[in-house]
Amino acid sequence: MSRLFLPPINRAMRTLDPSFFQKTIPLTAAHVLDGRNIPRVTKECARDLLRVPRLRSVITQKDDAGMERKLLLLRPEVKHDDLSTAQPKTREFVEERIIKLEPYTLHMKYESWNYEEIMNAILPEDLEEIPCAFTQAGHLAHLNLREQYLPYKHLIATVLLDKNPNVSTVVNKIEDVGTGSVYRTFPMELLAGQDNTNVEVRESGCVFRFDFAKPGEAVADVMAGVGPFAIPAAKQRVFVYANDLNPESYKSLVGNIHVNKVSQFLTPHNLDGANFIRESIRTLLSRSRNPSTSKVSIPTPGKRGQKRPPPPTVIPVPPTFSHFVMNLPASATTFLGAFRGAYRGLEDVVTGQEMLPIIHVYTFHKSSVTENAAGDICADISRHLGREMGEGDLENLENVRLVSPNKTYYCVSFRLPANVAFEDAQVA
């Protein structure tokens, strides 16, 4: 992009002042006298049109009488009072009175430029690059700023927040906090936006809510297939137990774990779904209590010139699952009975309703009347759980898509009721 269209520079800025970023640029516009000629003029005068990212070359403007007219913004080299600066076709259209060249003033402001352009105008030139990389989970953007960028962290975060409409919270990992503790679990510093690390992520019609400041949640994927949900979740440092009964799917899942290098966070299983539900609950608890398997260590990138590597980030394995995912819409609800009594004997571990998992079940609703879906799905869930479940018990009911005229694909989410989890006898 030409320097002419870049924002003004202020390398002394430490607190963002959007009003500083304003620019007035004199240009030439071609007034298309008959709007029907716009496609033709746009095509044949393409070499003279203004080409700047995020700026439209065709604009609508009202004249003194309030009538709308179409203008084509031209490149800066074209002068309205010097036809020799325009391409031959543009000159020809002027002579034929198809267009009329006139002066135009382009006003640019803070909203006109993106994150990289603003940061290039305010960060010191001797910094190697603009810090652009961040991890996004729901509304939260997570930065991991290197030392040289820390004096500008609030400035960086504020601009990042402004330029990403889906972000409302920006945090930075604090490298030096917690180095003396057993678990270095992502201490966070709020840099900009709302002080809210409870994020909501949508995946294949399901809604997952978790606290980003508390890493290492555990998820059980009961019908995982080759890992389309499990692999991305493990990459976010979520402990995933992934299961599939099909030996070929299991084989592919194991291969995908290796290729994607997520073996520390993803454990594959090849079991019947009901058996997996019951066994995984006990297996995870045992893992969390075993000193040799109760945590995962992740190397922490060292700072430039640092002689000794920093302590690793240590993520403890939780004792219980936060979520169970059951994506087999034709029969997933029939496996819900496996949760009946599955937590029996674990009352000392699961000390509150909030420690019981959110269950996400995919299912079909075979009716063209979608208004009946919630009631019908709740009745199906109730039948298999052995407990009445109403619409008020659901965390979420998502219409994923219409599969056929009389069949709709849903994802329903609810927290496992305590009287089901601790039922006296497990039901086959």
Swiss-Prot record:
S-adenosyl-L-methionine binds at D244, L245, D272, G273, N327. One of its GO terms (molecular function) is tRNA (guanine(37)-N1)-methyltransferase activity. It is found in: Mitochondrion matrix; Nucleus; Cytoplasm. GO terms for cellular component: mitochondrial matrix; nucleus. Its EC number is 2.1.1.228. Residues 287-311 are annotated as: Disordered. InterPro entries: MeTrfase_TRM5/TYW2, SAM-dependent_MTases_sf, TRM5-TYW2-like_MTfase, TRM5/TYW2-like_N, tRNA_Gua_MeTrfase_euk. The keyword S-adenosyl-L-methionine applies. It catalyses: guanosine(37) in tRNA + S-adenosyl-L-methionine = N(1)-methylguanosine(37) in tRNA + S-adenosyl-L-homocysteine + H(+). GO terms for biological process: mitochondrial tRNA methylation; tRNA N1-guanine methylation. The keyword S-adenosyl-L-methionine applies. Its main location: mitochondrion. Residues 287-297 have a biased composition (Polar residues). Monomer. HAMAP family: TRM5 (MF_03152). Belongs to the class I-like SAM-binding methyltransferase superfamily. TRM5/TYW2 family. Specifically methylates the N1 position of guanosine-37 in various cytoplasmic and mitochondrial tRNAs. Methylation is not dependent on the nature of the nucleoside 5' of the target nucleoside. This is the first step in the biosynthesis of wybutosine (yW), a modified base adjacent to the anticodon of tRNAs and required for accurate decoding. PANTHER family: TRNA (GUANINE(37)-N1)-METHYLTRANSFERASE, TRNA METHYLTRANSFERASE. This is tRNA (guanine(37)-N(1))-methyltransferase. It comes from Tuber melanosporum (strain Mel28).
